[in-house]
From Swiss-Prot:
UniProt source species: Bacillus cereus (strain AH187)
Taxonomy, superkingdom: Bacteria
Catalytic residues as annotated in Swiss-Prot or TrEMBL: 111, 129
Full protein name: Lipoprotein signal peptidase
Keywords tagged on the record: Aspartyl protease, Cell membrane, Hydrolase, Membrane, Protease, Transmembrane, Transmembrane helix
Pathway(s) annotated for this protein in UniProt: Protein modification; lipoprotein biosynthesis (signal peptide cleavage)
Function of the molecule: This protein specifically catalyzes the removal of signal peptides from prolipoproteins.
EC number: 3.4.23.36
Cellular component terms per the entry's GO annotation: plasma membrane
Amino acid sequence: MIYYVIALFVIAIDQISKWLIVKNMELGTSIPIIDNVLYITSHRNRGAAWGILENKMWFFYIITVVFVAFIVFYMKKYAKTDKLLGISLGLILGGAIGNFIDRVFRQEVVDFIHVYIFSYNYPVFNIADSALCIGVVLIIIQTLLEGKKTKE
């Protein structure tokens, strides 16, 4: 199914980008891409977003395995008839597995995309995080649009 190819693409790009960061940048170093907006910063995270639940790897292992199983089940059941849902779930699946690979093999997640939004220093993130967020946003948009159609 094409949605698994999307997940594999996300995993590949995520893992290659993280490998490049680990091999070519010292932890904590930063390269400006757009001054005061976008940087490539070598960072590690032993928890979830904003460092929540730091060093609770077994929790993340269990949650991720259950979550991935749910996503695969949901994809098999609903993605055949709903392309946008399939794409969204493919992005979410790829993102979840990308960060899971880091947690299993590194005991931490490699983050490197560092954004400043106006004066807010947004937490450093990675390709897997981006795919997860985009997938969730697409599902929310689809849900809102379907809700609007139902009301009409």
